[in-house]
Amino acid sequence: MDIDPYKEFGSSYQLLNFLPLDFFPDLNALVDTATALYEEELTGREHCSPHHTAIRQALVCWDELTKLIAWMSSNITSEQVRTIIVNHVNDTWGLKVRQSLWFHLSCLTFGQHTVQEFLVSFGVWIRTPAPYRPPNAPILSTLPEHTVIRRRGGARASRSPRRRTPSPRRRRSQSPRRRRSQSPSANC
């Protein structure tokens, strides 16, 4: 069965695979970032968003991977076999966890639509032959003007920011308007 964990987020595993393997930060750096930015949301009882749920699941997978590698390191006596297995785990499962953490952290940080646009534009850029493409790849950290950065905490964080409508103009004084008396020079 071919399951794409990014389909419900409007993306695909194929789009993430356009990014080079060294694009994704180290797993420990991603875990530290997730913990630093979203510890309350990840450890709390309340459901925040599908991205938070996916990060929780990726962190559980990462924890199980580290336990598996520790077990293999202590139980496999052949250094060569141990190295082959650890490298295979890091290159396959570790990469999938890195991709997942990067994707969901980026969606929470920059917005899902911005990440989607980045993946598509990078995919187009990388598939364009070198002589015909611009020299610089698209950059995710360059935010378009219309991107809304999410607010931290509270129930309002999940809603879009409130639009401010202009308030009606008020009179300068609250007392009824008085008619100005005309000056004597105005009568001339």
UniProtKB/Swiss-Prot annotation:
UniProt biased composition (Basic residues): 150-181
Subcellular location: Virion; Host cytoplasm
Sites bearing Phosphoserine, chain numbering: 160, 167, 175
Annotated region described as Disordered, given as residue ranges: 150-188
GO biological process: microtubule-dependent intracellular transport of viral material towards nucleus; symbiont entry into host cell; viral penetration into host nucleus
InterPro entries given in the database record: Hepatitis_core (IPR002006), Viral_capsid_core_dom_sf_HBV (IPR036459)
Keyword Cytoplasm: no
Start-end of each Sequence repeat: 160-166, 167-174, 175-182
Region span, RNA binding: 182-188
Keywords, in A-Z order: Capsid protein, Cytoplasmic inwards viral transport, DNA-binding, Host cytoplasm, Host-virus interaction, Microtubular inwards viral transport, Phosphoprotein, Repeat, RNA-binding, T=4 icosahedral capsid protein, Viral penetration into host nucleus, Virion, Virus entry into host cell
Region (3 X 8 AA repeats of S-P-R-R-R-[PR]-S-Q): 160-182
GO molecular function: DNA binding; RNA binding; structural molecule activity
Membership in a protein family: Belongs to the orthohepadnavirus core antigen family.
Record note on quaternary structure: Homodimerizes, then multimerizes. Interacts with cytosol exposed regions of viral L glycoprotein present in the reticulum-to-Golgi compartment. Interacts with human FLNB. Phosphorylated form interacts with host importin alpha; this interaction depends on the exposure of the NLS, which itself depends upon genome maturation and/or phosphorylation of the capsid protein. Interacts with host NUP153.
Name recorded for this polypeptide: Capsid protein
Biological source species: Woodchuck hepatitis B virus (isolate 8) (WHV)
